[in-house]
Amino acid sequence: MDMKIQVAMLCAALFALAAFAKTSTPEGWLDDYDAALKKAAAENKHVVIDFSGSDWCGWCKRLDEEVFATDEFRKGAAEKYVLLMVDSPRDKSLLTPEAAKNNPKLVKKFNVEGFPTVVVLDSKGEEVMRTGYQAGGPEKYLKMLDEEIRFAPEIKKYIKPIDGAFGTKRKRRSGKTKARAALQ
């Protein structure tokens, strides 16, 4: 084969590989918040948002390896949930330009102060629950999500009245947190 053709084929393969490796979004997960909400509304599903630090957070890596990256989780979750990855890697080249721009805004919007944080939204985009790493594998994690979501409406009945009791409101922490510091 001609040397020029070999070099051209090698360059094409490298560009294709670079384009494919440009994202840290796992198979079966979206990285676009608006697209996830639209899909959830259209399919009447909850959105599971994984706020992760994929290249530096040990607990995030464990959650991914033990739960989210498994076929059992992806198959079980696909029936009930829209999966959204909001990654905050130190190596920003792992993100698409859109994710690099939007992910810090989502971390702030959802007041994420530590990683991993898993936020579940209903099909209307309202927060239902939040959690993080849970040991036990994909079956146990899916069961925990199902149970928390099932009981969330009952729990909210009691939490909302308490929130404004005695003229007070829960204060969200302010200042620079570890999560926000990691994004800068």
Task: Tell where the protein language model's regions lie, with residue ranges.
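Bacterial N-terminal signal peptides
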Residues: 8-18
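Bacterial Sec-dependent signal peptides at the C-terminal "C-region" and cleavage site
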Residues: 17-27
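Loop/turn elements at helix/coil->beta-strand transitions in domains of secreted/extracellular proteins
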Residues: 43-47, 79-85, 113-116, 123-126
